[in-house]
Amino acid sequence: MSLITSTSPHATVKNNTGAFMRQVIYATLPGLAVLTWQFGWGSVINVLWAVIVALVSEALFLKARGRNIAFYLKDYSAVVTAVLLGLALPPTAPWWLTLVGVSFAIIVAKQLYGGLGMNPFNPAMVGYVLLLISFPVAMTQWLAPGEPLSLLQSWQLFTGQLPVDGLSGATPLDTFRTVHSAGASSEIELASHSILHGQFAGLGWEWVNLAFLLGGLYLISRKIITWHIPAGFLAGLGLPALLAWLIDPVRFADPLFQLFSGGAMLGAFFIATDPVSAATSRMGRLVYALLIGVLIWVIRTFGGYPDAVAFSVLLLNLSAPFIDYYTQPRTYGHKSSNRGTN
């Protein structure tokens, strides 16, 4: 009888990088569906175009590096980057805006660092910040929620055949920032604003964030991500908002508004949880995410941008190695958490 032997590892797991990435993509579908329900087909068009741009950009760069294109594209990391950036863009974004952001994210923020696992910053957020700084008007033109455009209208916006000026309006966070900077009562003005209609996070936006919350809980249930970063993120955003609101409810927005408006849930469950650029230890993840949440609240409340998920995530990506150094667990057999010391 002949015995067939193979090299280790002999114990394997069903999941691989591609399988994990596909689960992340599936988890974004509820959020994409609600964005389509509230704003029309613009987000779907953005995501599909972003995926095409990401795959082509990655394939061209892999070919230039002499790498196996099919092998590396199967990990779906480029698709995840494209989906997240496509979801973050306004549904009014023209085709060239997505092209610039996604190609920069894949080529500069990911491949120039060596590819998957080497990038110190979240590629999707690098692309987003580039667009926000370079094209601020195009990046802040959102449609009024609850009045979705048809597929034809969305396509005309995407191709530049339909002007966006008469269709776009301020988001709830834009309204809050304007009211806050003017020194008016956020409680009164936000409640009476035509977009809000008394909703706790702005008409439509609470549903968008609830959908991404549902997708995030799915990722936790499938053990794709752990609870540490989402919990720290939401606590860091919600607790300062609660404290400020209790002190001065006229000036500061309440915590529900902060948690369920803008990209809060997308950031908490899909962006800050990037395993490559985030902190790695359990305590480090909590500290990392807590600081992201606090920074988002500070920039939203006192800064010049209505939302701040991208800036906050990138700043804490930069700090992640420092956080890991001081929060690494104690190695078994050592008294100190610093490896190699007794």
From Swiss-Prot:
Which cofactors are named for this entry? FMN
Q: Where are the transmembrane segments?
A: 42-62, 68-90, 124-144, 200-220, 227-247, 252-272, 286-306, 308-328
Q: What are the recorded Gene Ontology BP terms?
A: electron transport chain; transmembrane transport
Could you list this entry's UniProt keywords, alphabetically sorted.
Answer: Cell inner membrane, Cell membrane, Electron transport, Flavoprotein, FMN, Membrane, Phosphoprotein, Translocase, Transmembrane, Transmembrane helix, Transport
| Keyword hit for Cell membrane | yes
Where found in the cell? Cell inner membrane
Residues annotated as carrying FMN phosphoryl threonine in the record are 171
Q: What class of enzyme is it?
A: translocase
Q: Does the keyword Cell inner membrane apply?
A: yes
Pfam families recorded for this chain? NQR2_RnfD_RnfE (PF03116)
Q: Give EC number(s), comma-separated.
A: 7.-.-.-
Topology within the bilayer: Multi-pass membrane protein
Alphabetical GO CC annotations of the entry are: plasma membrane
- Family named by the database record: Belongs to the NqrB/RnfD family.
- Subunit composition and interactions: The complex is composed of six subunits: RnfA, RnfB, RnfC, RnfD, RnfE and RnfG.
**Record's function text:** Part of a membrane-bound complex that couples electron transfer with translocation of ions across the membrane.
Q: Which PANTHER family match?
A: ELECTRON TRANSPORT COMPLEX PROTEIN RNFD, ION-TRANSLOCATING OXIDOREDUCTASE COMPLEX SUBUNIT D
Q: What is this protein called?
A: Ion-translocating oxidoreductase complex subunit D
Name of the gene this protein is made from: rnfD
